[in-house]
A protein has these predicted regions:
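Mature catalytic domains of secreted/periplasmic carbohydrate-active enzymes
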Residues: 19-139
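Hydrophobic h-region of N-terminal signal peptides that target proteins for export
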Residues: 9-18
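Sec-dependent signal peptide recognition
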Residues: 2-10
Length: 139
């Protein structure tokens, strides 16, 4: 019964949650319509393959869950994550040339890896990788 009441309270409380951006800002973004969405993160290093075998369940960014990879093994992927061909200027130019008005990029996925430098964790693209890059700042 306690679990049910806790669940109901959580639902009720979440109804009062407010957006992190203003309604005006959201409306402006929504009117842009044509945007680039970039799904990029530590999982990109694996390319949907774990230990030489393709992981066909789920999406590539879900590889840790669907391949049953332990957190420390998955975390070791950061030691070789060095996307030297990532070119923020080229990406922005491509989006502009295509008439896109905004770019949305994954800053932190459910694996917990941050694509930006942060003081809250070392598990990020600057502190945990050989490339020492803040991809969000570059964008």
């Amino acid at each position: 019964m306690k679990k049910l009441l806790t669940f109901i309270m959580a639902c009720v409380i979440s109804l009062g949650a407010t957006a992190q951006i203003s309604e005006k800002a959201f409306e402006k973004w929504h009117q842009n319509k044509y945007s680039m969405f970039i799904h990029f993160g530590l999982y990109s290093e694996l390319g949907g393959v774990w230990e030489g075998n393709p992981v066909t369940r789920g999406y590539s960014e879900q590889i840790q869950s669907f391949a049953g990879i332990f957190s420390d093994w998955y975390g070791d992927t950061a030691l070789r994550f060095n996307p030297t061909l990532f070119d923020a200027d080229a990406i922005v130019s491509l989006a502009k040339e295509a008439g896109m008005r905004s770019i949305i990029i994954t800053t932190k996925h459910h694996d917990g890896f941050c694509m930006f430098r942060t003081a809250t964790t070392d598990y990020n693209s600057y502190d945990a990788t050989p490339g020492k890059r803040d991809f969000i700042k570059e964008m």
